[in-house]
A protein has these predicted regions:
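Short, conserved secondary-structure transition motifs
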Residues: 149-155, 246-260, 367-377, 571-572, ...
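Non-catalytic, conformational "gating/processing" segments within enzyme and secreted inhibitor domains
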Residues: 145, 198-230, 428-429, 621, ...
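A common structural junction motif
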Residues: 128-138, 230-238, 347-358, 585-592, ...
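Positively charged n-region of N-terminal signal peptides that target proteins for export
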Residues: 1-4
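Alpha-helical scaffold elements lining the catalytic groove of polysaccharide deacetylases
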Residues: 188-193, 197, 642-645, 650
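M16 family metallopeptidases and their MPP-like homologs
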Residues: 41, 46-62, 68-72, 87-131, ...
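Bacterial N-terminal signal peptides
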Residues: 6-15
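Proteolytic maturation boundary segments
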Residues: 18-38, 219-260, 268, 303, ...
């Protein structure tokens, strides 16, 4: 089980993306006459390409009194440009299998497009068009303002720990531009005017304030010609105003802040220290310190607090910026544990490092981890592009993707002791104590909308000459890696995925039958058993396993779901012997120590307590329990079942599934089939036994629409999950269903998104889809909407479903859907892990691997009639299970206009 994460951060640092200093990227770098920095990076591993443009403007540049403006503007950049209509980007990209997105940081705003490599001209044309000019109308400003406010309420105001996270990323900074949250404050977002948007674009969205990276399967000459033709004529702008210089300020005493949160079930403690910028000479030592404390199961906080069952989460994080950064402890205790104990233990571990230093072995482990994670970070075209952008932005050298590792290799124990003393003093702390409260959450704020909207002529800074995208390039074929299937004499299936360009080894064992094969009076047993496979064998303790693999930069993992148990090992290829040795030991000799069982029980009880505060979790849990009543898929874990499960139950269940004829071993990486089979035979040939096949009970029949409302007082949003029983997991109906859902709610340009998000502004995000388990899955539509529009939003969903059931797709729609899915195919298999997961899914569902080779043909053969048949065969709104989580006093009357409502109390 992944530990409950209070705060999920994607930290793209040079340390995390660095490999070996003697490596070099195949790149060209130059500057156009208008000041645009261009970096072209060639990697022909897959026929994909990423166009990634960073503008040097972030939340630090928000106008005074208008926090969140850079974020609001990022949304506005998708509202149209001289040659692209409102929301037209997705309608251009999705039919060719491409996608586009953006994000705002403190220091910059990134826009990226990923496309099959022959569609590079389209992606470049889109970015050039919106660099030149932007369509800004009062209508689309008001619409995006509503979406941003909905996002803010969903991500912070209506979410457990959201207020604390917002405080953590702003309050500790002494640097004034960093004290404004990137997402903004609702009152400030409501102040934005059209003139502000146009001025912001003209000030910051100029070529001399941007860096364009094109990474992937490219030809340098052809790409340079496209870039020069499309971006070269855009005029240089005035140099944007510089931010004030950061001057460190000594904090005289610690700051203590109590945050009352009506949505949490578990208190939390956050401790933050301001630290120097990422490029500062002391940053690597602080980063290594954070990794020594909390990266990996063999880290110090993991051993001190998580292994002992005291903490659900005990992490040390680094927040890096061009200006000052942060070092932070994030602590969430298990049920009944005093947070003061966790806080004191964290300080003691820090002091122990100050007093005793860090052994070279731990430093070597950190460097090994940086290296292995760096390899994975460069595996995709987008990962490569983002790593190059980061290296160039912070260090002025894209090759720092590799050379940056030297900063980390130079870190000594003395350096770590010195920076801990200098930057992590008691007086430097900002301590946030997050506690439960019975107080009501503040009411939702309505987005501002102009009463009188006047038609306006576009006011573009520049219009590029090319009114249509250049034609596509010649397409490159996607070459599957060699995938072989073999069966050992004992019945063990062995699949080898040969990927010689990836210097890693990935080993995964999957057993058929997870929760579906466990005693149904013990829900949660499969999850506990799965998690504990890696936590001790007859020869090794959990720390022995974690220490051995993490010392070489690898990792182990395991888990249990509805249809399977799985365990895996990842390592660099030079450590293949260790990887197989650990995998075999865990598979064959897992012994489920009593202390680990009790630790897992405590963690799961605390995680369930925390998750029950999340409306999305409650909605999904309630939907599944009602839809699959009496079936293992609906058998939700409870506090009572967690208390009842014993070690004997765990051992008996694992032993019932742990047999070679019930398993598949998937080997991926820089290894041949012959080598893989030799290792498999060496470690698993003597394994014996036979497992009972999994059987499934009949599914419940649902007749008539059911509306269930889970009361969550104070909730500012309504979270819904609606749907019905769907498709058998191995069915070929997957392919027409995929095409149908692509149009209905599977993409950003889909009907549901365009209607309910873009036209109505009811939600930040909505989507629909089918699940494909080993038995029969579901069809479901999911969203979070404003309280005042829950009934209208659901009515729009029903309208779109009726439309796709009664009106054939247009020629353009079905062609775009099929072509888009075909184009997406290569991105679904861009990494080694994509292949492993696809093979595992096929095996667990009983699908022949040859379907991968036929996949594109099946999609291309889907007709309009197939789409109508699927929509009517598998979507039944008259029999929907409708689950809504929200404040009953605000939304129950609305829901009653749709039918009888059953009110449920939150668990």
């Amino acid at each position: 089980m992944k530990r409950f994460v209070l705060l999920m951060l994607c930290l793209l640092t040079i340390g995390g993306a660095s490999l070996a200093a003697d490596q070099q990227l195949d790149l060209q770098q130059y500057v156009l006459d208008n000041g645009l920095e261009v970096i072209l990076v060639r990697d022909t591993t897959a026929p994909t390409v990423a166009v990634d443009i960073w503008y040097k403007v972030g939340s630090a540049n928000d106008p005074i009194g208008k926090s969140g403006f850079a974020h609001l503007f990022e949304h506005m950049m998708f509202e149209g440009s001289p040659h692209i209509p409102d929301n037209g980007m997705d309608q251009l990209l999705e039919p060719v299998g491409g996608s586009s997105n953006a994000y705002v940081s403190t220091d910059y705003t990134a826009y990226y497009d990923t496309v099959p490599s022959h569609q590079l001209p389209l992606a470049l044309w889109i970015e050039a068009d919106r660099m030149g000019g932007l369509d800004v109308t009062q209508e689309n400003l008001d619409n995006q303002r509503a979406i941003v406010i909905e996002e803010l309420q969903r991500s912070y105001d209506n979410r457990p720990y959201g207020t604390a996270v917002k405080a953590l990323i702003t309050v500790p900074y002494s640097y004034e531009p960093y004290k404004r949250p990137a997402i903004g404050n609702i009152d400030d977002v409501n102040k934005a005017q059209i003139e502000d948007v146009l001025s912001f674009h003209r000030t910051y969205y100029v070529p001399n304030n941007a860096t364009l990276v094109v990474a992937g399967d490219i030809d340098f000459d052809a790409t340079r010609a496209l870039v020069d033709a499309l971006f070269g004529p855009i005029p240089r702008g005035d140099d944007p105003p510089a931010l004030p210089e950061f001057v460190p300020v000594d904090q005289e005493e610690a700051e203590y802040i109590t945050i009352e949160d009506p949505f949490i079930n578990l208190p939390a403690l956050l401790v933050a220290y301001e630290i120097p910028p990422l490029i500062h000479e002391d940053y690597p030592a602080l980063d290594v310190l954070s990794r020594v404390l909390s990266v990996g199961d063999s880290s110090r906080l993991a051993k001190r607090l998580v292994d002992t069952g005291k903490a659900l989460q005990a992490d040390a994080w680094i927040f890096d910026n061009r200006g000052p950064g942060q070092f932070a402890f994030i602590l969430v205790g298990n049920v009944g544990v005093d947070l003061a104990e966790l806080e004191e233990a964290s300080y003691e571990e820090l002091q122990r490092i100050i007093d005793e230093g860090v052994p070279q072995e731990e430093l070597d482990k950190v460097i090994a981890g940086i290296r292995s994670r760096g390899i994975l970070g460069l595996e995709t075209a987008l990962g490569l592009a983002e790593s190059v952008q980061s290296a160039s932005y912070y260090f002025g050298d894209p090759q720092a993707v590799f050379t940056g590792v030297d900063r980390y290799k130079a870190v000594s124990s003395e350096d770590i002791q010195r920076v801990a003393i200098e930057y992590l003093e008691e007086s430097d702390r900002h301590v946030f104590n997050v506690v439960e409260t019975d107080a009501e959450a503040p009411p939702p704020v309505e987005p501002y909308a102009a009463e009188d909207v006047v038609e306006q002529e576009p006011d573009y800074r520049y219009v590029i000459e090319q009114s249509e995208p250049p034609p596509p390039l010649d397409s490159n074929e996607f070459n599957f890696p060699t995938i072989t299937e073999n069966v050992l004499d004992n019945g063990l299936e062995v699949v080898v995925i040969e990927q010689p360009n990836m210097p890693i080894i990935s080993l995964d064992v999957y057993f058929a039958g997870g929760g579906t094969a466990a005693p149904q009076d013990l829900p949660g047993l499969a999850g506990i058993a799965g998690d504990l496979i890696t936590r001790g064998t007859t020869a090794r303790s959990a720390q022995d396993i974690a220490g051995a693999i993490e010392q070489v930069g690898g990792a182990v993992g395991s888990g249990g779901g509805g249809d399977s148990l799985q365990l895996g090992v990842f390592a660099l290829i030079e450590d293949v012997d260790l990887a197989f040795e650990l995998l075999a030991d865990m598979t064959l000799n897992a012994n489920f120590p009593e202390n680990e069982v009790e630790r897992e029980r405590a963690e799961r009880i605390s995680a369930l307590e925390a998750n029950l505060a999340q409306p999305s979790f409650v909605a999904g849990r309630t939907f599944g329990r009602l839809l699959y009543e009496g079936h293992p898929y609906g058998n939700a874990t409870t506090f009572e079942s967690l208390e009842a499960i014993t070690r004997d139950d765990i051992v008996a269940f694992y032993e019932s599934r742990r047999h070679p004829d019930n398993a598949v071993l998937i080997i991926a990486g820089a290894i041949t089939t012959e080598e893989g089979l030799e290792y498999a035979t060496q470690h698993f040939a003597d394994w014996e036994g036979s497992a009972e096949a999994v059987s499934y009970p009949a599914l419940p029949e649902h007749s008539g629409r059911q509306i269930l409302l889970v009361d969550r007082p104070g909730s500012t949003q309504a979270t819904f999950r609606i749907g019905n029983i769907g498709i058998q997991g191995a069915s070929l109906d997957y392919f027409p269903a995929r095409v149908m859902n692509h149009v209905l709610g599977g993409t950003f340009s889909s009907r549901l998104v365009q209607n309910i998000r873009e036209e109505k502004g009811y939600t930040y995000g909505i989507g629909s889809g089918f699940s494909y388990p080993a038995d029969i899955g579901y069809f479901r539509v999911s969203a979070d909407v404003r309280n005042d529009v829950i009934a209208p939003a659901l009515e729009e969903v029903f309208m779109e479903i009726e439309r796709i059931q009664t009106e054939p797709l247009t020629d353009e729609e079905i062609n775009d859907a099929r072509d888009g899915i075909v184009g997406e195919f290569v991105f679904g298999l861009e990494t080694y892990q994509d292949f492993v997961e696809s093979v595992a899914s096929y095996k667990i569902r009983g699908v022949e691997l040859d379907r991968l080779n036929k996949w594109l043909g099946y999609i291309k053969d889907v007709s309009k009639d197939d789409v109508l048949d699927i929509a009517n065969s598998y979507i039944h709104p008259e029999d929907f299970i409708i689950v809504v989580v929200g404040d009953a006093s605000e939304i129950q009357e609305q829901l009653e206009t749709l039918g009888e409502v059953t009110l449920l109390e939150a668990e």
